[in-house]
């Protein structure tokens, strides 16, 4: 009996330990389910990380759990990445993070010009992304530049990036900040806003370089007699350039506001980085303007070629008409009913007449050929 009691007493701690472990597992699962209960199915959350002192904390977090954790420490913030969220999901996140309804509407519709707005303690930055679409040849249906949108909400303890379209994936940006530029993350949410903006503008430069290569091909085709008419390609490139300009040019004002010392929006250390991005954007804007001027010059050159070709055709018509006039005049003269035509009585009259016509024809042909009319 004593042995059975001792065995029972030894097994009771094991049972309590097993039960405690199961309760912790079930409790953690229930906590995860409850934390994500405020988000609809098919979540657009790409990544949600908590950063303390510039270092990402291990573990997976829901948006509301991440914000609660970030509010516990002074040097921490949340980076929440979204891809094409729906209205219901964006509204749930807005309630958690205190986002303004107008900014939420813009983030869902994704049809905004680049801008910077402030809603209380939250700044709302809109960027237009761009990506070069490879193609074999440029036609009137070719897509050269694919654009999308990037929205960035910058708060005191969070930064939310909302991406629409396939351009400017932020995975490499996040990895670069976490592994190679962790010191920059110590500056807080504006460091992420800088990294995202820098990524978008760097892609602008890549697109501009690819467009320049296309322009070289178009220019070569204009002055190559073997190619077809490049006018359709020129107009298509102008349309694509207009689309690219809509993404690039309006971003100048928001970046100028962020980089300005008077604004006081960002820390001084981050402002220096934004000024570098502003310089890159200025370079891109200058490239786009020069490309537009180059396209206009190429178009004018092509139209001048068409005019010259038409004039050459008209000169050819005029030259052959002049040669034909000689034969027409001779036929008219010989067809008249004169009573006395001395050449008819001459034995060499008929062959002499043909020899004279051929001589005049050859002389006219050589004259037109020498002057470039034929």
Explain the meaning of each model-derived region.
Residues 2-16, 279-374:
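Hydrophobic alpha-helical transmembrane segments and their immediately adjacent juxtamembrane loops
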Residues 259-271, 295-306:
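Long amphipathic alpha-helical coiled-coil segments
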Residues 1-267, 273-276, 280-290, 373-374:
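Peripheral, non-transmembrane regulatory/ligand-interaction domains of membrane transport proteins
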